């Protein structure tokens, strides 16, 4: 089994020293990943391509699939390597391999050569193509947009019969650019933006601001691990988790409603910048897209940037949501993102779209920055390779979901204030109380603990996460209400 790896074109136009460094890094990345598929694999680099050889034919599908997910590869050619004697011998070997595939179809022959020969690539194309056209039933030559393209490579005295061409991921090999820290929430945007920087050659570490307890963190860890396992497994990265619930509570208590969203984002940037500085990471990555939500206007993004000197990269800045969701589907994070609730955008009822710097600084002047410093100091840092084993050993937490209401039960509407006011929840003969999810941690203990509380939200996702969080805190009198 042999594969020929073709380099991403932008690599080939680099200077000699840079190109050689990129090829060395890509070769190392391929070795690191393929050793999990086949320990016998051999990876050999050349100036314009990389060869991959593996002894066990059973591992061919695994190796091929893994190669398509490694940044820096333009395409992969699965080949059969054979000796050849003359041009007619090349034709005969090609006929045996392609005869059945070409019956009733149009085709063309494309040849590449390396070495010194007494014929040109075009000579081989004409000779082999003419022979196939005469000896394969009901076929015809078509040089543009044929049904089948017969790909051949002649490498000195070896004939490479290309059995399959697989498209690669493109981009630069991971490790050719510097490290970044992705602010990951588990939603569509942050997952796609992380992938885009991995594809561009960055080793992507992950920073998660936990507002929803352990259940929320597990979901985000799954997204981060999926991205790493699928596209970045060649390198070790960190997953950093910060408990940001105290920071949110401080904002809710000290900051005016319309400024809360911007202040929260600025606090996240400050915290992430401190983490990046600790580990020598050069830039932050966010999934913000221009105008998608109120905090993502140019005025507000500029104010968010001003919170830190650390470079903030926004690869999705000009992308629309439909395109982002399409990319999430392609990279496999869509299913995770569908069930991930949005936290940051619901703490403010009337967020400003044109924040004023002096006003933001005035609001932040009332904020106790010791709370933020504590969150950074207590950040949990995990090697992403340990996440699966750690989650596999953790007990699976569950909480009961019900549509039935008892006479003494209380339905607790945990939606944000504007959602509650826009669509109030009214139930006959059942008490309904309101307590936004971001206040549950600090206010649930003040409620009458002799009663059973059924947590409600529109989709049932946020209510389940919050019920699990309350269970972790020792409250057993909670269920999820799904009418």
Curated annotation (Swiss-Prot):
THUMP domain mapped to chain residues: 61-165
Keyword list, A-Z: ATP-binding, Cytoplasm, Disulfide bond, Nucleotide-binding, Redox-active center, RNA-binding, Thiamine biosynthesis, Transferase, tRNA-binding
Subcellular location field: Cytoplasm
Reactions catalysed: [ThiI sulfur-carrier protein]-S-sulfanyl-L-cysteine + a uridine in tRNA + 2 reduced [2Fe-2S]-[ferredoxin] + ATP + H(+) = [ThiI sulfur-carrier protein]-L-cysteine + a 4-thiouridine in tRNA + 2 oxidized [2Fe-2S]-[ferredoxin] + AMP + diphosphate; [ThiS sulfur-carrier protein]-C-terminal Gly-Gly-AMP + S-sulfanyl-L-cysteinyl-[cysteine desulfurase] + AH2 = [ThiS sulfur-carrier protein]-C-terminal-Gly-aminoethanethioate + L-cysteinyl-[cysteine desulfurase] + A + AMP + 2 H(+)
Sites where the protein binds ATP: 183-184, 265, 287, 296
Entry GO MF terms: ATP binding; CCA tRNA nucleotidyltransferase activity; tRNA binding; tRNA-uracil-4 sulfurtransferase activity
Top-level division of the source organism's lineage: Bacteria
CDD domains attached to this UniProt entry: PPase_ThiI, RHOD, THUMP_ThiI
Disulfide feature: 344-457
Family note: Belongs to the ThiI family.
UniProt function note: Catalyzes the ATP-dependent transfer of a sulfur to tRNA to produce 4-thiouridine in position 8 of tRNAs, which functions as a near-UV photosensor. Also catalyzes the transfer of sulfur to the sulfur carrier protein ThiS, forming ThiS-thiocarboxylate. This is a step in the synthesis of thiazole, in the thiamine biosynthesis pathway. The sulfur is donated as persulfide by IscS.
Listed name of the protein: tRNA sulfurtransferase
